């Protein structure tokens, strides 16, 4: 599709099509430093694809009733918006593309309230996710079927 963070977009697509999902505890995704990759390139408006991809995953989880993970997914979306936005110029932050990214965040925040997804347990899970993603995945999804 020519978007950045297409691997994240693939997650939402795969969730929609999957009949069953398994948690594999080993990290299978290896980052490599490659000249010209999005990891090493200057942040531009195009990096807002990251926000769009995270919103797609959030919405997919919401549509399928996975409300117990919406807080964590919202934090990922919000963090990506803040991270990308902080690297853009003041002029870039006023563009329609940035406004669309902000709208994704607003919709997700509204959905959190509508789904009653902000609970003490969800906030605790999100806090653990923020502190250590490795530890979060180790404890939150261990031995679940």
Q: Where are the predicted features?
A:
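Short glycine/serine- and small hydrophobic-enriched flexible loop segments
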Residues: 16, 56-59, 83-86
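Conserved nucleotide-sugar donor-binding catalytic segment
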Residues: 1-50
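Membrane-interface aromatic/basic loop that binds lipid-linked glycans or pyrophosphate carriers
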Residues: 63, 90-145
């Amino acid at each position: 599709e020519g978007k950045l963070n297409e691997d994240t977009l693939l997650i939402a697509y795969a969730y929609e099509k999957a009949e069953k999902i398994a948690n594999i505890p080993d990290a299978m995704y290896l980052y490599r430093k490659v000249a010209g990759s999005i990891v090493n390139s200057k942040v531009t408006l195009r990096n807002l694809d990251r926000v769009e991809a995270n919103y797609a995953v959030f919405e997919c989880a919401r549509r399928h009733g996975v409300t117990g993970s919406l807080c964590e997914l919202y934090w990922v979306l919000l963090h990506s918006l803040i991270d990308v936005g902080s690297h853009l110029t003041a002029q870039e932050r006023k563009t329609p593309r940035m406004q669309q990214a902000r709208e994704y965040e607003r919709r997700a925040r509204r959905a959190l309230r509508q789904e009653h997804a902000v609970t003490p347990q969800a906030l605790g899970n999100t806090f653990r996710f923020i502190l250590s993603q490795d530890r979060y995945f180790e404890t939150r999804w261990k031995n679940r079927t």
